[in-house]
Amino acid sequence: MESNYSDNLVNEFKTTYKLEGTDFWQLKRGGKSQWIIKHNALEKVAAQDKITWTLDVLNFSPDIVVKCIATSGDRTVESLGESSSKNTMMQFPYAMAEKRAVDRCILKLLNAHAYIYSDAEADDFKEPTSNRVKSDAHNKLNKIAENKING
C-alpha cells in the first residue's frame, strides 16, 4: 500500500507541477525502495502552490538547528532541520539545515511526508550518477532548443 501511494504521489507531482522524471529517483536500501525528490523540485512546487515560510535559527554551534514554519492556504506546519558534522559532509551546514527544514514542511503540506524524502535529508540520498547524466543531457537539449527558437 505504502509503495503504491508513494508511486501515485510521484506521478501526481510530475503531472500537477510539471516535474521531470529526473527530479525523482528511487533509493534502494535493505531490500526496499524509497522515492527521493530534488530540493529544487520542491521549491518549484512550493512556488506553484504559493507555499510561504519563515525560518529561525535555534542553535548555531556545534550543531545547527533551523526551525521552519510554512503555510499554504489555511494550513500551517512546522519542522526542524538539523545539520552537524555527523550527518552532513557538505561544507555548508547552515544551508543544509535550512533545506532540510523547508523540504520537510513542503512535504508535510503536500501530504507526502514519510512517503517521499528530499535529497537534502542525508548525504547518502544523493542522486545516482546515471540519473545525473540523463539530467545533464536533458538540460543540454533544452538549451539547444532555446537557442534555435531565440535565433
Q: What positions do the PLM features span?
A:
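Polyanion-binding surfaces on beta-sheet-dominated domains and ring/shell assemblies
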Residues: 1-151
